[in-house]
């Protein structure tokens, strides 16, 4: 096992022990052990295990050292397996309900016999949770809302998690000899934060072998549909995938149609009808009567659809009726439009902009020159400073911004003033050493306290290259209070960036109440950058705000909020948000070269 995997097991052991009401010192020992393991370089961990010296490390000891060595060597731990077996499976599931921790779960189990989601739901609906000391009616309401959200969330999946699944399937489809073209479609192709299912469009010379390959994919739990040109499967993860096979001349039309969105497709069909054409997944063909440039009634759309359906089969190229296109750019051109990137197809003005030639040149991954808001083992990160910088350098980045947690984030090992000063000195020495070509900026993810003050004093903040101000506590404030709190932090002269504006955790936690418009206006007025937090669970500030905000002058920075080297790749999902928000390269701070970035931060510090 790697150090990260070992730490995950140790943290799970701590949770299980807490659920079983074991000695708190024992719980803390496993939590501390996980942090120590995270702080090792992989090579150092290997050396300590091989030499039998783990027990000599402060915070580990003999018994824990043996368990870590067992995990590192065999990939499993008998103690862990027995502990899991001793706890009802539903108890771990309860930890996924927002607001429930081990202590509350223990009370619910002892007082109300709660052992899983079903018994918790019943206890809430009967009002028994509200009667418990330390809970009350509001807590009961929050628990029920959390259960409801969890059920809704369970039908969706993070873009980041399903994108590699889709890529693997597309690659496999393209390798089949019968397949001429294959692409993913749907919300995944549009870069939407969460995805309900996967859609694949394929042009093939022979259908049956392709369908058979698809339904036989590894991890398929159930084949939910199988027809002559379609198939649907559900994976063991709950993710559903749909396959549609079309003649090659219909491929582009099907790809456009099933990419969506629904609103975009309606506008495209209206535009086609206004030109005497019918646009569908089958093709682009003349209809009997055309409308005007104004909005076309839905009855006209229905008539056009019926006209397509009444044909004996999909129109083929060469019959002098269907427009022949080789790609989506030609499809848009046939309707007098510039190509609309999939990320923009949400029915929010992209068709009009494409007609006027006003679509932006969207930011791309290759435009990024570095990043900010990254954590190390100094707080709750899983890799050391040097490991993180080496990973940034391997990506070709010119700069890398450290931003470990501030002192009030005790749960994340936030840095005291003394520890932060030590880190600033360490970064300065690393830059001076010439060990890396990538320049390191010293920073902090500084807590915005409940009253809007920052977590460090001005003198210490002035020693940093940049400051990311973020809310990490007291999420229950009303909208006016939370908005004023964040604006006060924005108005602090040392604040460089605002972190994760709404605090949402996708599929887990709703955003706190905040007036995003007022916060955006305050950021613009004070020259504060608002980050696109690219963590797949956050993607905050969300794309729907960015077009108008950027037009007003708001500057963004695509930050991964990385806690380990592999998470630097999260910027890919942040680029999705930026593109969906119509952002150009020049509207994203970390597309700038090192020189201009250093100068900007120098001037910002005053």
Please give the residue ranges for each predicted region.
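Charged, compositionally biased N-terminal leader segments and the immediate start
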Residues: 1-22
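Accessory alpha-helical DNA-binding modules that contact the DNA backbone or grooves
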Residues: 14, 24-231, 252-254, 273-282, ...
């Amino acid at each position: 096992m790697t150090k990260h995997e070992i730490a995950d097991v140790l943290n799970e052991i701590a949770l299980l022990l807490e659920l079983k009401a074991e000695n708190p010192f024992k719980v803390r020992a496993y939590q501390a052990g996980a942090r120590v393991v995270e702080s090792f370089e992989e090579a150092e961990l290997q050396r300590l295990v091989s030499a039998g010296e783990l027990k000599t490390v402060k915070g580990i000891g003999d018994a824990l050292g043996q368990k870590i060595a067992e995990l590192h060597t065999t990939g499993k731990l008998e103690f862990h397996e027995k502990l899991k077996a001793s706890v009802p499976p539903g108890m771990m599931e309860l930890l996924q309900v927002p607001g429930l921790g081990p202590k509350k779960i223990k009370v619910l189990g002892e007082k109300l016999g709660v052992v899983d989601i079903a018994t918790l739901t019943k206890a809430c609906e009967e009002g028994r949770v509200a009667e418990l000391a330390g809970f009350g009616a509001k807590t009961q309401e929050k628990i029920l809302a959390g259960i409801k959200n969890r059920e809704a969330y369970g039908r969706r999946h993070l873009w980041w998690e399903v994108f590699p699944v889709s890529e693997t399937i597309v690659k496999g489809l393209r390798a089949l000899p019968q397949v001429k073209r294959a692409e993913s479609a749907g919300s995944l192709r549009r870069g939407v934060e969460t995805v309900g299912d996967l859609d694949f469009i394929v042009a093939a010379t022979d259908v049956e072998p392709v369908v058979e390959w698809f339904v036989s994919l590894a991890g398929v739990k159930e084949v939910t549909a199988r027809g002559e040109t379609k198939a649907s499967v559900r994976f063991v993860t709950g993710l559903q995938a749909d396959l549609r096979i079309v003649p090659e001349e219909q491929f582009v039309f099907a790809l456009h149609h099933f990419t969506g969105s629904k609103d975009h497709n309606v506008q495209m069909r209206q535009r086609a009808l206004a030109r005497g054409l019918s646009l569908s997944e089958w093709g682009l063909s003349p209809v009997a009567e055309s409308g005007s440039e104004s909005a076309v009634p839905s009855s006209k759309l229905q008539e056009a659809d019926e006209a397509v359906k009444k044909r004996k089969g999909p129109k083929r190229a060469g019959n002098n009726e269907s427009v022949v296109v080789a790609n989506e750019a030609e499809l848009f051109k046939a309707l007098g439009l510039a190509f609309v990137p999939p990320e923009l197809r949400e029915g929010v003005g992209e068709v009009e902009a494409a007609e006027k030639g006003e679509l932006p040149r969207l930011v791309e991954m290759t435009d990024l020159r570095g990043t900010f808001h990254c954590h190390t083992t100094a707080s709750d990160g899983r890799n050391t400073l040097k490991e993180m910088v080496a990973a940034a350098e391997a990506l070709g980045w010119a700069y890398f911004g450290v931003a470990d947690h501030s002192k009030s984030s005790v749960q994340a090992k936030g840095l005291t003033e003394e520890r932060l000063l030590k880190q600033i000195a360490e970064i300065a020495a690393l830059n001076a050493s010439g060990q890396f070509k990538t320049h390191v900026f010293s920073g902090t993810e500084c807590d915005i306290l409940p009253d809007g003050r920052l977590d460090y004093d001005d003198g210490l903040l002035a020693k940093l290259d940049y400051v990311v101000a973020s809310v990490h506590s007291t999420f229950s404030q009303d909208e006016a209070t939370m908005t004023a709190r964040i604006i006060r932090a924005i108005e602090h002269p040392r604040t460089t960036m605002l972190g994760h504006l709404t605090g949402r955790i996708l599929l887990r936690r709703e955003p706190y109440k905040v007036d995003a418009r007022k916060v955006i206006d305050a950021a613009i007025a004070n020259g504060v950058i608002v980050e696109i937090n690219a963590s797949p669970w956050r993607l905050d500030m969300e794309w729907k705000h960015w077009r108008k905000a950027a037009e007003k002058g708001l500057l963004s920075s695509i930050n991964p909020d990385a806690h380990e080297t592999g998470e630097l790749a999260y910027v890919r999902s942040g680029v999705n948000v930026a593109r969906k928000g119509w952002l150009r390269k020049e509207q994203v701070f970390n597309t700038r070269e090192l020189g201009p970035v250093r100068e900007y931060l120098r001037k910002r510090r005053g």
